[in-house]
Amino acid sequence: PAAQQVELTASGEGLDLANINDPDNFNKVRLSADTAITLQAETDIGELYLVFDRPVEWRLETADGTEQACGQNGFIHEYVELEQPASTVTLHLPADTVLCEVYAFTPGQVPDWVQQWQPPCEKADLLVLPTHADDEHLWFGGTLPYYAGEKGYAVQVAYMTNHWGEPYRPHELLNGLWTVGVRNYPVISDFPDLYASKESLESARQVYNEEEVTAWQVEQLRRFKPSVVLGHDIDGEYGHGAHMLNAATLLSALEMSGDAARFPESAEEYGVWQVPKCYLHLWPENTIQMEWGEMPLAAFDGRTALEMAAEGFACHVSQTQWFEVKAGGSNDCRKFGLAYTNVGPDEAKNDFFENIPSAFGGPA
């Protein structure tokens, strides 16, 4: 049965929780100490959906004293199914938690807008490596709606920088991925988004340690063992130094990920991996043009992959005045080149997975 959203009464010592299920992430509750928040409803709650500003481990307690450990996966948009439905539940949250929203539902199938994230892929068919939140839609176009949403491939997104300093952006990031059909939670690196990295490759090298970024790239390749990797334009699209550094370190990492002597820590943890093929946006050799605007997707009621890329980008409310998803122009989101291959050149040039048989670790 379909779950119904239930009205909640929320209480916690000294807290104003009146707006806690207002879908405006700017109404936040900041906890200065370990805090218990009690939620009461007139009917049994079967599921909760919570939005935090940062990952947090917490406990859920029902009236009979049953406890559930939550937040183990580090998701800031967290769906919780109660082991035993109850009309009163208590959230035990640690100091420094920033809680934005809480929604409760009767037992059953929750609405589609509730993000039920899966952990990152065990093995990815496709690994996509944007630098900042929104790059995945702007420069890679219909890639995510087509391969994740429509084809159901295991698609892992890993961001080279984080936006914890601008707390609204991680929410935009997750909302955009969810909108285009990605269901495996993204990897978000420990490298902060730094404005000083923008001007040139050299400026990016001054604020990021290139060796550390390369190690991070190698780790992603070994961890997710992708059949296909997708990265930025080596010239940084509109010339962004951090995009350039991302592409340059990725090209280096592709040569190292199969060698256990390079960055041995991640080799020990994940084993080594030789990537079959990697495309870069706008790479001038072995070019391929993905006609996202001519790909209607049944998973999205016939909207095209290009339309869905624009819909994903529209979730990045703080960025929409600066950019738009475009097929055409100098940063055409349809144009890619095969920058690295262990499976030969493309012939048909209409699918990133050309020459990737399922026996070679491609999609089943």
Language-model regions, residue ranges each:
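The feature marks non-catalytic terminal segments
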Residues: A2-V29, A41, F52-W58, T62-D64, ...
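Active-site beta-strand->loop->alpha-helix modules in alpha/beta enzyme cores, enriched
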Residues: G12-W58, D64-F263
